Design a protein with these regions (language model features):
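N-terminal Rossmann-like dinucleotide-binding module
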Residues: 1-39
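Residue-level signal for inorganic ion chemistry
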Residues: 7, 29, 52, 176, ...
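Donor/substrate-binding cores of folate-linked one-carbon enzymes
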Residues: 21-25, 32, 81-200, 204-206
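N-terminal beta-loop-helix "entrance" segment that forms/cooperates
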Residues: 35-55
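Conserved beta-strand segments that form the floor/walls of ligand-binding pockets within enzyme
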Residues: 60, 105, 148, 242, ...
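Glycine-rich, highly charged phosphate/nucleotide-binding loops
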Residues: 60-70
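Short amphipathic alpha-helix with an adjacent loop that forms part of the alpha/beta core around
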Residues: 68-78
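An anion-binding loop in the catalytic cleft
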Residues: 213-306
Length: 306
């Protein structure tokens, strides 16, 4: 099958790598434009563009695609199918309607649950034990197209965004190859999305702030959902502290939510117990363990997170 691949970040690059190993022919790639590095003005290509360049595949990086900008590229490459994995732009109707087999999207949830931009984070936030990949035929809605193939992925108690992302990317890559093969052979039939849906919105700063008046489990899930990026955070003595890793604490603890209840470890009172902030990064400093952080404080009395 002749395929144009549209994607941008690492997740998409892993899928493209697997696609290139398959019997399909990748005739072109579309990715987001290069963006300035955070600490310099140097333009950095996406992970997908880097991979395509290494494999000598023609790449388009249009600023806009709404008004036919991609049509000449599609007419030139003439794909049987367009594969879309975390591309980052909404596809207009002329793109959706172009290929024989339609536009196939790899989405990081078991649809219709967690439609939207952050399905992996929301699965962790909500303490799910299982999530997965859904391939679907794209329509003009947001993750509302007919489903093609689902792959389940188990979530372990110590998974964070990084580890679950990597498991999901590997599952997504295999799902993609199986989906294209099934479509071409007529072995996969599109299925309407049914049942309750929910939306995984973009992550904002307020969502990342830790509220210690919440339950321990809720706080634990928030920390792992945003680790290592964009990172959950709290404030200690007026300074922002990023939290990368936490551990639930057993036992009963006195004090009010947010109080630090140990002088040697950063154990913080919650609404129903306590949680240890094991690995942190104080504002402007490197990542460190909580014990090293506390050793560097002169006055530990009355310490609190808020």
């Amino acid at each position: 099958m002749r395929v144009v691949f549209m994607g941008s970040p690492d997740f998409a690059a892993i899928c493209l790598e697997r696609l290139l190993e398959s019997d399909n022919e990748v005739v072109g790639v579309v990715s987001q434009p290069d963006k300035p590095h955070k600490r310099s003005s140097k333009l950095i290509p996406t992970a997908v563009k880097k991979l395509a360049a290494e494999r000598n595949i023609e790449v388009e990086t249009p600023d806009k695609i709404k008004n036919g900008e991609l049509l000449p590229f599609l007419e030139k490459t003439n794909p049987d199918c367009i594969v879309v994995v975390a591309y980052g732009k909404i596809l207009p109707k002329y793109v959706l309607d172009f290929p024989k087999y339609g536009c196939v999207n790899i989405h990081g949830s078991l649809l219709p649950k967690y439609r939207g931009a952050a399905p992996i984070q929301f699965a962790l936030l909500n303490g799910e034990k299982k999530t997965g990949i859904t391939s679907m035929l794209m329509d003009e809605g947001l993750d509302t197209g007919d489903m093609l193939l689902k792959t389940e992925v188990e979530i372990s108690d110590d998974d964070n965004f990084e580890t679950l992302h990597d498991k999901m990317a590997a599952a997504g890559a295999e799902n993609l190859v199986k989906t294209l093969s099934g479509l071409e052979k007529g072995e996969i039939k599109p299925e309407k999305q049914t049942g309750d849906s929910c939306y995984a919105s973009l992550i904002d700063k307020e969502m990342r702030k830790i509220d210690f008046s919440a339950a321990t489990e809720e706080i634990y899930n928030k920390i792992r959902a945003f680790s290592p990026v964009p990172t959950a955070f709290t404030t200690i003595s007026g300074s922002i502290v990023k939290v990368y890793k936490a551990k639930r604490e057993n036992g009963s603890f006195s004090g009010k939510p947010g109080d630090v209840v140990s002088e040697t470890q950063l154990i913080v009172k919650t609404s129903d117990g306590a949680i240890r902030l094991c690995e942190i990064a104080p504002e402007g400093k490197r990542r460190m363990d909580d014990e090293a952080f506390l050793r560097g404080l002169r006055d530990k009395k009355g310490l609190a997170c808020n």
